[in-house]
């Protein structure tokens, strides 16, 4: 069945109605929580995938999203969302990682097979190529995920694209921090290497 994205739209609308222009709301664009196999796309159906993402992007814009953040790692998603919504795009550069396991267990989105469209942790060259492509496709911001395991790529991608580059401190990274002081230290490290922004479950503690 085609999702109607009502839950996503309602959440965005509620947040924006409460905070209005006090915040810029960046909203994740993906479908891993709606597919039966836990994948970020409809496997082997790129046109269907893009049609769904465009539909989701339009509805998120109508609900009040300020920035769209596609995390699917599919070809043309950044370009299509930029053209169809005219919103700023924050594009993920996502690696296949074991550090997502806690979130996947909680969201019941563990994929039925390997997410081959994500980048191998042993292949930094692909991250450089993908970042450059997203830049050409119209991305306004780039974000590496996970954070700590991609820290060596931040400077390179910033130099190649001249775009703000941030990190996503994922579930297993965050759960491994025993105190708020440990959290703040990771923030200082990301800032030290030139990270422009940081997404973390502990944002309110910083």
Task: Put a short name on every predicted segment.
Residues 1-206:
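Alpha/beta enzyme core
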């Amino acid at each position: 069945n085609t999702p109607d994205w009502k839950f996503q739209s309602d959440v965005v609308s509620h947040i924006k109605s409460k905070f209005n222009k006090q915040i810029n709301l960046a909203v994740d664009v993906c479908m891993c929580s709606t597919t039966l196999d836990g994948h970020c796309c409809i496997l082997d159906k790129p046109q269907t995938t893009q049609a769904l993402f465009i539909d989701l992007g339009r509805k998120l814009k109508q609900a009040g999203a300020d920035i769209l953040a596609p995390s699917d790692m599919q070809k043309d998603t950044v370009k299509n969302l930029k053209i169809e919504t005219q919103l700023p795009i924050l594009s993920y550069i996502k690696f296949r990682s074991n550090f997502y396991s806690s979130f996947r267990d909680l969201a019941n989105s563990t994929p039925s097979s390997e997410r081959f469209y994500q980048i191998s942790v042993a292949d930094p060259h692909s991250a450089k190529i993908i970042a450059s492509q997203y830049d050409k496709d119209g991305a306004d911001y780039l974000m590496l995920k996970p954070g700590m395991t991609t820290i060596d790529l931040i400077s390179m991608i910033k130099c190649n694209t001249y775009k703000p580059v941030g990190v996503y401190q994922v579930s297993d990274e965050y759960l491994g921090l025993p105190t708020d002081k440990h959290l703040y230290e990771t923030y200082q490290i990301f800032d030290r290497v030139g990270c422009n922004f940081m997404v973390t479950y502990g944002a309110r503690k910083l």
